[in-house]
Amino acid sequence: TRTRVKTPRGDYDGTIRTVVDLITQLSDGAPSQPTVGVDMPGIIDPRTRTVKNSNATWIQGHTFQEDLEKALGRAVRVANDGNCFTIAEARDGAAAGAAVVFGATLGTGCGGGVVVNGVCLNGCNGIAGEWGHSPLPWADKTVRQGRPCFCGQKDCLEQYLSGGGLARTYRDIAGRKVKAKEISGLLAENDADAVRAIEIYEDRLARALAAIVNILDPDVIVLGGGVSNVERLYDNVPGLIGKYAFSDRFETPVVKAVHGDAGGVRGAAWLWSENEVDA
């Protein structure tokens, strides 16, 4: 069963109630009490157990997992949405069978996750895979310095590679606002400004992924999120990565997620699988 509800933005207690109501609704009629996995924007700090690095800023600083467990009266497993996405694609998705997988989510934000031999890496600080808050590498004159990010920095990858980042690039070129999802339609119409915006986007994405390749050298790179539905990315970005990666050849497959926008919730369900997360 799949159900969507709106998140009560700005209301932490309302968010907890909404999640509890959704879980209760989906649990009704189940032959046994199901396990509960939650994917969320941001991470649970391994030291304080509070939420940090979330663009859902109203949950920042709260003990989300413990509060949800108390409200439900049972154990819950929670992980970053980029990690959950990557777990799903590594387990039975586009990267099934690969030893080292990097998953990149290009949607409302710009997230990521790393799965090695079936285990999602969290890291000492709980931020493994958080590439979206690194600066754009090999920046050139096409970058307009000063795009502020909710994290307090400027010119994070998220400000260029998220859907909003793509829309802003289009606005810089065309002088008018459009939503990111409208750009695909403009590309189909061969709109010159949309074509230029996506060309710039592809080069920026290639630079960002090349930095990942230079450090991790994954066997597969999986793209998810709304922008990943732009099909030309898969034809153009791999060749561009080769310009920046520290290698005389680039052979890593860059593939589209097979689970679509269900990847995060599928990965959350996998959190109860033994040894799934390097906590």
Please report, for each region that a protein language model flagged, where it lies by residue.
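ATP-binding/phosphotransfer module of carbohydrate and carboxylate kinases, centering on a glycine-rich
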Residues: T1-T35, I44-T48, E66-V76, E89-A98, ...
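Residue-level structural signal for beta-strand termini and adjacent loop
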Residues: R4-V5, A56-T57, G126-I127
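Conserved NAD(P)H cofactor-binding loop of Rossmann-fold oxidoreductase domains
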Residues: P41
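A charged helix-plus-loop insertion that forms the helical arch/lid used to bind
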Residues: R49-G61
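Glycine/small-residue-rich loop that forms an oxyanion/phosphate-binding "nest" at active or ligand-binding sites
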Residues: R77-N83, I87-E89, G103
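Active-site glycine-centered loops adjacent to acidic/histidine catalytic or metal-binding residues
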Residues: D81, G107, A268
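Glycine-rich phosphate-binding loop of actin/hexokinase-like ATP-binding domains
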Residues: A96-E158
